[in-house]
Amino acid sequence: MDLRQLEMFQAIVEAGSFTNAGKRLHVSQSAISRQITLLEKELGVQVLMRSNKRVFLTDAGKTLLKHCHRVFRDIEEALLEVSQNETISEGSLRVGGGMSVCTYLLPHILKEYHARHPNIRLTVTTGTSEPTLEKIRNNEIDIGILTLPVESHDLEVESIIEEEMVVVMSPSHPLSTRKELSVKDLDETPLILFERGSNTRKIIERFIDEQDITANIIMQMENVEIIKPLVDIGLGITIIPYQSIVREVEAGTLHYARIAGHPLYRKLGLVMLKMNYRPIPLQRIVTLFKEMISTLQVLPP
């Protein structure tokens, strides 16, 4: 077994066929087929099933793929550790997170990061927790800023901030005259919430269950930027992070209220693959988050 065979095996899985893998690696289909046959012969098990020009992983293949990811990640880390020094001249950093985090918290961090490291190429991907975690595990994203908790047996998680969730409504809503609401005020009130599956939605659902609120969820959205205009026109109220409505509150287009006696918070954390050595661009943004996070407005005045 050699690295080239593992590279071919991984390319087949990612490309979906021997033909596409050959195109990606610039080798013939027959050469790839021959190497996979040798690999399976050496392992003594079948790792790929061929059917109608498609390939599927066997259980042994799934195990091998997991270790392939680890092997190539370790090699990449080794090369980085050997070649990098403390001065970043060039490189890239891939960041992922939820829409509210990427819209309202991350820009301040990235502006300062770019000022300090202008030659680092930055890529930002938005998504809910599960897709972002999958991208981190597949080495498609270097770092995620996610609502905690997350399943972390293979990940490094550093809690960075706790932000308050508030009830948000149109200024014309009957509840908008108050700065604090009781739990009972939420009973049967039309709610527009984040979609199921997001960690922020889970926090809200747990609060609803614990307080025995009769929830009237009329809509669910994946994007806070869609939720806000629906609330603005009076379709319902919502529960979202305060940081996402700072501008609207200042402009008077949305009103917010706390829940009396039951403040609702979500914790955000930095999520990365466990590794012996963090690439310098990744080290720098972790440090920057810790430096700047206290300067960001995430709690109501």
Question: What kind of feature is each model-predicted range?
Answer:
Residues A11-S28:
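Short helix-boundary/capping micro-motifs
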Residues L39-E40, Y113:
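Conserved amphipathic alpha-helical core elements
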Residues E40-D59:
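A short LG(V/I)-centered, amphipathic sequence patch enriched
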Residues E90-H153, T214:
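Central regulatory/effector-binding core of bacterial HTH transcription factors
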Residues L105, H255-V298:
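A late-sequence structural motif
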Residues T128-I141, L146-T147, T200-H255:
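Hydrophobic hinge/microswitch elements
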Residues S152-S159, E163, R178, E225-K274:
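Beta-alpha-beta core module
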Residues S176, P190-Q211, R278-T287, M292-P301:
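Secondary-structure junction motif
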